[in-house]
Each structure stands twice: as structure tokens, then as C-alpha cells.
């Protein structure tokens, strides 16, 4: 059928095509049928939804979908039934526990990106991967397909280094130190980062406090070739676009298939042209990987996948049993990270982890002899070279290179929790800290978060401050206080835990 485009002033986040009920009846189209909207060489696929918001002879598409294509208001298009994609058969094959061939995986990924697969079909694929898994042949094929269906970065400066943490630890602003340290040593490190999904601040959320993070691929190439590094948001790029779509299904189902997680991380490294990749796997209670045994198994998978992609991968299994540094939340973390770069000093957990990871990268890149990388990283940090490089990165990304950490605004609605008893800090609950910071407004409210005054093993007296909640709004502060009282994120115990009498 022929119809005219009507742009709906809404952002659906889905490829839904609104069709008038009379038109649908005449064209024998039903809700959720896949259709192709075509005009010349332009085409987009979407699922049918019947609606009286569009008149007869019109087809409605939301503005966010139109932004990705070049259709215009009133343009005449053909609405063509698309049938069931062949990739659905391949998804059913994986649902039955069978191994997928490379061409079948490529078809599934291509149809996800082209929006030929509906949400229910994508969810079925993700669920099948959770239940039946993927072997390394399938993971490698999935990784390459996810990368090659999006944009690829080609930077002349070599070698290209990269670092990625699988996350789970609150306050992980480590890479904001790692990147300028590595770049100051003459290596190239184009770092793309995510925004927070379930955490209180992703690296991109923190960097956005003092510099722009949204750039095109061409702009990133110019920045990196000028200063040797960047700290940007990967979501603004068309890197491994299938990943962004499957993540929505994972989030809705609260699952994270290992094979898909490996492909998600490594496809973006592959697309960025990374040659040497360091994977940080935090391990401990309250993070994604709780045991060293799990971490070692995952490390072997990353290394093997890297070999198949032509990348040299090393893995650092790091301590993740409590927050890194003393701050959680975008602005608070920005202050702490920039202060550490500016002075060469900071919380032990932050400095040790940052220089440890940077040191491994320096050795991988051949600028530090084996066993000397961490020492070299510390020298670069303490000499001020890392701060000078960070200022170059900030300026290249549109920020003020003369920024002062203490001038970064933080939430002025505060509440401080104090120790109810004297003793030693025996545990800090990562998940509770994250939940409280999010309740306070992080990461959407940049100034919201938590400032920690104690860490595990430290002695406290009754009445000593433990942590302060920062918020930008009183209502959010109240929510965070209620949650903190309920979860009690910091545990304090005496040396004598319990007395049992002789009964």
C-alpha cells in the first residue's frame, strides 16, 4: 500500500509503525506484523500498531526513528509486508540447544540492527543464550558480526591500547587516571565508556562533569590523533549497534549471558581498532564476579576470544570488596579523580588500582620493561605529566583545562551518618552504597552521591562520621536517608563478636 509519512512528536525507543485501522484491514495487516517502509533507496522496518492517531492514507513513525533515517513529513512511501525473517529459524535452533553457524549468527545480528526482529524475538534470542550458552566459535562470530554491522574507527597512531572494567564496584573512577598516565607515556588509548545502567556513575557520567563526551567518530579520530587519547561516551557512536538493542532485552529480563557479555565488550574494542586490551575483573562480595575461580574462568575466555580477533588481551583480577576511593556519584568522583591527577596523591585504593592497571598497559605497549610498569605509572602520576596530559584531553573535548576540582558543584542537601558504636569497620556493602547514591539522584543529578569517611579495617569511635549523602533535592535526600537506615551499608563490630556463657 502507498501512504504518506506522518512524523509523530514522540520518542518511542522502538521501531513501531502506526497504521490506520481501515488501511490495515484493506492491506490485511495485523498488529505486530513486520513491514518495510520504502521510498527509493531509503528503507526502514517496523512492527505494525493500529491507531486512530493517523488518518487513512498515513503511516506514523516516531521522531527518534525518523532521526536515524531521512524520511520527511508528507513523503509518499510504500508499506510492504516483510514476512518472517529467516533469522527467526536460527533463533529457534539456538532455543533447541543447537550450535549456530557463522552465517546464521551474522543473519541474526544483521536483522537485529535492521530492526527486522521484534522485541519478543530479540528477547527469545537473549534467553536462548542464557539457557544454552555459546561456544567460543559462536562467541567470536557474534563479536565480529556485532562490530562489522556498525562503524569502525581507523586511527593512524599505533599501537592502540584499551582498558575495560566489567564493573560492579562503586566509585570506580580508575580509568580517568589510567588513560592520561598511559597517554603521557606516548601510547595511544582511545577510551569509550558507558553511562551508568545500574551503578551510580559510569565513567562517561563522571567525565561529562568537566568535559564533553558526545562526539562523532571523525571527531574522536581528530582528538586522538592530536592528544593521543580520549574519554568519550560510546553510546553517541554507532559502535556495535546490535549491542545497544540486546542490552535492553537483558535489562528487561535481568539476565546477562556470559557469551553475549564477552561479545558486547570485545566487539567495541574490535570496532575501535584496539590492538592491546586489558580487562579489569573486580572480584568480591557485591560485584558481578564474586569468586577468584569465576574470575579466572572468565579471564581465560577473554584471552582466547582476543586471540581469535587478532588482539593481545591480558586480564587483571582486582579487589572489588568495597568502593574505590572515598566518593560515589558523578561530581564527587570527578573531584576525587582530578585532585589525584593534579596532586599525584589520593586514596590508596584509587592510586594503587590506577597505577597497577596503567603499569600493565605500559608493559603491554612496550614502553616499560616487564615488572617496572607500576613504578613508571606512579612516576608519571607524581611528576604531573599525567595531569598535563589530562588537561590536553579536557581541552580537546571542549572543557576548561584550568578547572579546579574544589570548584565542581556537588549536592548541597546533605545528611551525615555516624557510628552507633565503637569498633572496626568489617564490611561495606557495595550494592547498598550504590542503591543509596542512586536514591539520592545519581547519576542523573550530577551532584548527588556519597562521600565515605571510613574503609574496611579502620577503627572508629561512637559518633565518628561514616558517610555523607549528597543530593540536589530534599525529596531525593529523604529517600536516600530512609534506604540507608534500612540497609546499614557500613558494618562495625568489636574485636569480641559474641560471648557464649556456660549454661
Swiss-Prot record:
Catalytic activity: AMP + phosphate = alpha-D-ribose 1,5-bisphosphate + adenine; CMP + phosphate = cytosine + alpha-D-ribose 1,5-bisphosphate; UMP + phosphate = alpha-D-ribose 1,5-bisphosphate + uracil
Keyword Glycosyltransferase: yes
EC number: 2.4.2.57
Superkingdom, natural source: Archaea
Alphabetic keyword roster: Allosteric enzyme, Glycosyltransferase, Transferase
SUPFAM superfamilies reported for this sequence: Nucleoside phosphorylase/phosphoribosyltransferase catalytic domain, Nucleoside phosphorylase/phosphoribosyltransferase N-terminal domain, Pyrimidine nucleoside phosphorylase C-terminal domain
A GO term for molecular function: pentosyltransferase activity
GO process annotations (BP): AMP catabolic process; pyrimidine deoxyribonucleoside metabolic process; pyrimidine nucleobase metabolic process
Biological role stated in the UniProt entry: Catalyzes the conversion of AMP and phosphate to adenine and ribose 1,5-bisphosphate (R15P). Exhibits phosphorylase activity toward CMP, dCMP and UMP in addition to AMP. Functions in an archaeal AMP degradation pathway, together with R15P isomerase and RubisCO.
This protein's name: AMP phosphorylase
Organism, as annotated: Thermococcus kodakarensis (strain ATCC BAA-918 / JCM 12380 / KOD1) (Pyrococcus kodakaraensis (strain KOD1))
Lineage: Archaea, Methanobacteriati, Methanobacteriota, Thermococci, Thermococcales
